[in-house]
Design a protein with these regions (language model features):
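Conserved phosphate-binding elements of NTP-dependent enzyme cores
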Residues: 2-1009
């Protein structure tokens, strides 16, 4: 049963009229017809033994305050059980490869389908993943280019036609007389297996040698290949010296090689250093980035011939057009210099020597600690040889001295004597100085583990575009193949909208159309699915790691739409995140399409338009955390809107609204301006941000909001004011910063990386709580210090569970079992530590309190209560003090950071930057958050926020609207001014929706609270 008294008080607290007991007893509508999904006794997380039913094959939206239990029902109960049942239908052998699923805490779920979860997390951290690879469109591109692509010579650009045997022979005979050749027939190219039959057949055919994985071997020898590895086998058909009368033998050998390898032959051409061809051959090798020994008397050039692809003028052949040639994740297609990444980590002199005005002894070379006896001894010898002092600032060294310090000299042998650390004797060293750069490279290559290498990369390296492929990831042979005048990389650089237009206008021959029709159909479908979920501004070459959570989720949604599965239960987590109101209808159309083809679509959502479109609405509440977990209303949106005990229902009925300010702040008269911003799609724009006011940056998805605020403005302002060293995008000038003393960006990244991190450790209040316990008379009598009350270090924690409170037991084919520690009984600390009490509560009891409870408990300790109150003020009163940071959503993590900043003393001259802080928030939570933000501005601070929520935009003092479209169609300032001024701009999409909201409020008259 619902706690009626609590509900009364809760609604009174948030400013909603009290409700009647009768209305609460009639808030659940039964499913009257058709198949249904029934949940009975769900107790996962904060769900209070709830039971609910809803129709199958419908669009079902779950709403409620943040932390009320929406995700617990949707993901941790429905999805988890649907996936678990499917996995249990598999064999135990198959299950071992698929991970283990916990059984949710629920009595019964009936009517479930196999479940697919589409969450808002950005899961693609691999730098090789792009929008194209994630959506599989790039796979179809590779197939398309392999089938109808037109190859061109990488050197002269001429279209390459098929090569006949005579053309191949003529090309070889055009080389200098006396040239030594080895003719290879590549019978196996990069395939796994032992390939015993291939080798035996070659022997039987009379061949005696082969090149296997780059090494020449005798076929008579015992050859054993690892069947788990990929191998390349090239049979040596003949070894020839070019001379008069050799044509017939050469022709026979070429034909034999071509026949054995399906029209492909490799010729190893020995070019001596004094040959005329040496310069042109080495130039070609350099252009391709192919390594060779520059000091050798000759080089062996590998010339690839094909009966299909070769330039008759330059003699350049390219491999057979296969899909793998166009893959930057395959060695046959990837740029050999950067291995398909498009960029390389290179040593950054500015990071190694961040301040050249310092000397070595002042740690001018960041990597080398001058206090180290080894470094001191070694660099003393270096300085002596170069003729400078270790106290000399590095920027005062001569060019010759610095060159020796940086690059070394292998011809100069240094002597130095090193005193052993043990103090027992000395060691004498005689060796050349390799230079700082080479010494760091050696240490990097010899590093004992990945963590040490990663540390060196982060500290002393920077990413730079690959000089060979210029960021295009592919080898030249792949980039010289075109369709419609564009190579595959140029095609991926187009936005989704531009690509759709490209394929619509593509002119193909009848034969090409017949070959490519099915592939083009798949490409067009997937591109249109991306467009329909509001991602038409994305380019396919964009790294998947740079996508926001909402973008990543909508990409996965488009992939699922493309798969056209039926009979599935889809569970989505706020797919409208990061989406402008203009694009919302297309997203809803995609969700209803999934429903219409025969799927159950369950969406956790706060967006009003989505709530009204739902076939069935489940509202969970009434509050968050321990105050939530109950079904407040269940039925059609119209039914829920009639339920007086449902906050969401009252919101849909228009009974609660966020009051629009009657007056807008003018600011304090000062502005921060940034001019000439040209990063990404921004088109040399300039904007002015009023100080002492609340500004919203708006615009359709992909219009350039994040680029302007996060990639350019914040790093530029922070570098000037906070003396940071963030990489800033392209801009010409930033001014007005003298009027602010701090700039703080509050994003949605996690507040901790381990399960032991929690909100109170992040904001620093747990240190104060530990200090309080250590200052108690009982703790002092026992000699306890602050560390005694930490569960992260030895001393006060329970060592049986190492402060975790639980013991993990691994089960083979069953989920891991977490049992309460039988020593501390889940308290985390040992018995002696728990005997120290404050107001009758131990340190463990405090960690189990909610923020709301703790704020009341510590009300007599101002420096603790004040920080806890800030967490409560941003709507986090329901979370526990000891709750793991890993369980917090992105929105919750952002609000913890906001609370941390609010807890600091305000100067009234701080500029706060927020990126969609309303993500994951219910209307009531947004109302509370906006109260906090408005208080910040009332103190004289400046808040600049990226936002799509029209309710929030209408609260702003000033709007900067970018657009008018996304991608190349955006990047311009469309409108600026107050919401009322922007609403009059007919070119602004944001202005249209703001105008609608203002009109609605005007028609409603006095807002009902």
């Amino acid at each position: 049963m619902l706690d009626i008294e609590f509900l009364y008080n809760f609604y009174y607290y948030i400013g909603v009229k009290k409700i009647s007991k009768d209305s609460m007893e009639n808030a659940i509508s039964p499913v009257v017809e058709g198949e249904k999904i029934v949940v009975q006794g769900a107790r996962e997380h904060n769900l209070k033994n709830v039971s609910v039913e809803f129709p199958r094959n419908k669009l079902v939206v779950i709403s409620g305050l943040s932390g009320s239990g929406k995700s617990s029902l949707a993901f941790d109960t429905l999805f988890a059980e649907g996936q678990r049942r499917y996995m249990e239908s598999l064999s135990s052998y198959a299950r071992q490869f698929l991970g283990r699923m916990d059984k949710p805490d629920v009595d019964l779920i009936s009517g479930l389908s196999p479940a697919i979860s589409i969450e808002q997390k950005t899961t693609h951290k691999n730098p090789r993943s792009t929008v194209g690879t994630v959506t599989e469109i790039y796979d179809y591109y590779r197939l398309l280019f392999a089938r109808i692509g037109r190859a061109h010579c990488p050197k002269c650009g001429r279209e390459i036609k098929e090569q006949s045997v005579d053309q191949i022979i003529d090309t070889i005979l055009s080389w200098d007389e006396g040239t030594k050749l080895t003719l290879l027939s590549p019978v196996i190219r990069g395939k796994k297996g032992e390939h015993v039959k291939i080798i035996d057949d070659a022997k039987k055919s009379g061949f005696v040698r082969a090149r296997i994985d780059g090494l020449m071997v005798e076929l008579e020898d015992s050859i054993k290949l690892d069947k788990q590895k990929k191998h390349t086998i090239e049979i040596v058909v003949d070894r020839i010296v070019l001379k008069e009368g050799i044509r017939q033998r050469l022709a026979d050998s070429v034909e034999t090689a071509l026949k054995s390898s399906n029209g492909v032959i490799i010729v190893l051409r020995r070019v001596n250093k004094d040959d005329e061809a040496y310069a042109s051959v080495t130039a070609a090798l350099d252009a391709k980035g192919t390594p060779y020994d520059r000091n050798a008397a000759y080089i062996e050039q590998e010339v690839f011939f094909s009966q299909k692809n070769a330039c008759p003028d330059c003699g350049i052949s390219i491999p057979e057009l296969q899909p793998r040639l166009f893959s930057f994740n395959n060695p046959f297609g990837a740029c050999p210099e950067c291995t398909g990444l498009g960029e390389k980590m290179e040593w950054d002199k500015d990071k190694i020597i961040p301040d050249p005005s310092l000397s070595f002894n002042e740690r001018g070379i960041e990597f080398y600690n001058p206090e180290s006896e080894w470094n001191k001894t070694m660099f003393t010898a270096v300085a002596k040889e170069a003729g400078f002092s270790l106290d000399t600032p590095l920027n005062k060294l001569t060019k010759k001295q610095f060159d020796y310090l940086w690059n070394g000299d292998e011809d100069i042998v240094l002597n130095w004597v090193y005193k052993k650390q043990s103090g027992e004797g000395y060691s004498e060293y005689r060796r050349p100085w390799p230079g700082v750069l080479n010494d760091m490279k050696r240490r990097y290559n010899e590093a004992w583990g990945d963590s040490q290498r990663v540390n060196m990369e982060e500290k002393y390296m920077s990413r730079h575009e690959c000089a060979s492929c210029h960021g295009k990831r592919l080898r030249p042979e792949a980039l010289c193949v075109t369709i419609g005048g564009k190579n595959i990389w140029q095609l991926t650089e187009l936005s989704v909208l531009q690509t759709i237009k490209f394929f619509d206008e593509l002119d193909l021959s009848e034969t090409e159309t017949k070959i490519a029709s099915q592939v083009l159909k798949e490409i067009r479908n997937r591109l249109n699915f991306l467009k329909n979920v509001g991602l038409e501004y994305l380019t396919l070459e964009r790294s998947a790691a740079t996508l926001s959570g909402g973008e990543a989720q909508r990409i996965r949604l488009s992939t699922q739409i493309g798969s056209a599965l039926t009979g599935v239960m889809y569970v989505l987590d706020e797919p409208s995140i990061g989406l402008h109101q203009r694009d919302n209808q297309r997203l809803i159309d995609s969700l209803t399409y999934l429903r219409d083809i025969g799927n159950t679509v369950i969406v956790v959502e706060h967006d009003e338009q989505t709530l009204r479109t739902a076939d069935w609405l489940i509202d969970i509440g009434p509050g968050a955390g321990v105050h939530g977990g109950q079904i407040m209303a269940s039925g059609s949106p119209e039914f829920v809107a009639s339920c007086k005990d449902s906050i969401t229902g009252r919101y849909l009925a228009g009974l609660i609204r966020m009051k629009i300010p009657s007056e807008r702040r003018k600011g304090n008269g000062s502005f921060v301006s940034i001019e000439g911003v040209s990063e990404h799609n921004l088109k040399d724009i300039s904007v002015m941000i009023p100080l002492g006011a609340f500004t919203c940056i708006t615009g359709v998805s992909g219009s350039g909001k994040s680029t302007l605020l996060n990639d350019v403005f914040f790093p530029a302002a922070s570098n000037k004011i906070m003396k940071t060293d963030y990489p800033a995008g392209v801009y010409k000038k930033i001014s007005g910063l003298e009027n602010i003393d701090k700039v703080i960006s509050i994003d949605q990244s996690p507040i901790g990386r381990t399960p032991r991190s929690n909100p109170v450790t992040y904001i620093g209040v747990f240190d104060k709580i530990r200090e309080l316990y250590a200052s108690l008379p009982d703790a002092k009598a026992r000699g306890y210090k602050n560390g005694r009350f930490s569960f992260n270090v030895k001393g006060g924690r329970c060592e049986n569970c190492q402060g975790a409170g639980t013991i993990t037991i691994e089960m083979n084919f069953l989920p891991d079992v977490f049992i309460q520690c039988d020593v501390c009984r889940g308290k985390r600390f040992n018995r002696e530590t728990l005997e120290v009490l404050y107001k009758g509560k131990s340190i463990s009891d405090v960690l189990d309190m909610t923020i709301e409870e703790a704020a009341s408990f510590f009300d007599s300790i101002p420096h603790i209560a004040r920080k806890l109150q800030t967490l409560k003020d941003v709507g986090l009163g329901y979370i526990q003090l000891g709750q793991s940071a890993l369980t917090l959503s992105g929105g919750e993590a952002q609000r913890v950071k906001l609370a941390s900043e609010l807890a600091r003393p305000s100067t009234g001259k701080t500029l706060y930057i927020l990126d969609e802080p309303t993500t994951g928030l219910h209307f009531v939570d947004i109302k509370q958050l906006m109260g906090v933000i408005q208080k910040l501005v009332d103190k004289g601070n400046t808040v600049v926020m990226i936002e799509h929520n029209v309710d929030v935009i209408c609260q702003a003092d000033y709007i900067i609207d970018l657009g008018p479209e996304g991608g190349d169609g955006g990047g311009r300032v469309v409108a600026t001014g107050t919401p009322e001024e922007v609403s009059l701009n007919k070119k602004s999409w944001t202005g249209r929706y703001v105008a609608e909201m203002l009109e609605r409020e005007k028609a409603r008259g006095e807002v009902k609270e």
